[in-house]
Design a protein with these regions (language model features):
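Short, well-ordered secondary-structure micro-motifs
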Residues: 7-8, 51, 76-79, 94-96, ...
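Soluble periplasmic/extracytoplasmic beta-strand elements of cell-envelope proteins
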Residues: 22, 37-41, 64-69, 82-85, ...
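Second-shell loop/turn segments in exported
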Residues: 8-17, 39-47, 102-111, 121, ...
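Active-site-adjacent mobile loop/cap segments within catalytic or ligand-binding domains
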Residues: 14, 64-75, 127-192
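A structural motif
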Residues: 76-101, 114
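Extracytoplasmic/secreted envelope proteins and their assembly/folding machinery
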Residues: 21-24, 28, 51-54, 81, ...
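Active-site-adjacent substrate-binding region
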Residues: 109-136
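Active-site histidine-acidic residue metal-binding/catalytic motifs
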Residues: 1-62, 87, 92-95
Length: 192
């Protein structure tokens, strides 16, 4: 957000930062209706560094951390939803070109990270009928430095004309939000 516009679609008029914030605010409202306490890393169009996000996570000690994004690719036909969890201890990241170079420390939430990502991805596919790009592992800064189970959701490709049009629609954003809520509830139920 703020000065970091993220990816752009629709000839540069549609900005990832705006779509992400719109979905995040809707997600906050939906989770609060269910009694969840929700802390946002940004509630307006403001800039917050990755380090700042990690520090907020450490300060508030949430039960989970969800990062919402829109994907982009040079090839405009690529589409679909993917959800990332922290790479487990000793494993390579899904997005590494040289897997042997990236094995390293996971975190104490390995099992929880993947379970939450799986539940959210499953619900997203059911609600949106989007292409399944899978649950993947990565050592993204926000996942690596979260002090709780964490996922990063790529809600679709802003670079794909059809998907960017969907992502810009309130009804499609509601499908995404409802799916994330369902995934969180299913994740929580699996640990009770």
């Amino acid at each position: 957000g703020g000065t970091d516009k993220g990816a752009a679609g629709a000839g540069g008029r549609l900005l990832e930062k705006n779509l992400n914030l719109s979905m995040a605010l809707k997600l906050r409202a939906a989770l609060r209706k269910l009694g969840f306490q929700v802390i946002m890393t940004r509630g307006a169009d403001s800039t917050l560094s990755l380090q700042g996000r990690a520090e907020l996570c450490k300060k508030y000690k949430p039960d989970l951390f969800i990062s919402i994004h829109c994907n982009a690719a040079a090839q405009k036909t690529i589409s679909g939803i993917e959800t990332f969890a922290m790479t487990p201890n000793g494993c390579a990241s899904s997005n590494d070109s040289k897997p042997g170079n990236s094995t390293g420390t996971g975190n104490s939430f390995d099992k929880n990270n993947y379970r939450m990502a799986y539940e959210i991805q499953k619900a997203l596919l059911k609600n949106t009928k989007a292409e399944d790009r899978g649950v993947k592992h990565a050592r993204f800064f926000v996942l690596r430095n979260a002090s709780c189970p964490a996922v990063l959701i790529e809600t679709g490709f802003i670079s794909n004309l059809r998907e960017s049009a969907l992502l810009n629609r309130a009804d499609y954003q509601a499908k995404i939000v409802n799916a994330i809520v369902a995934g969180v509830l299913n994740y929580r139920a699996s640990y009770r």
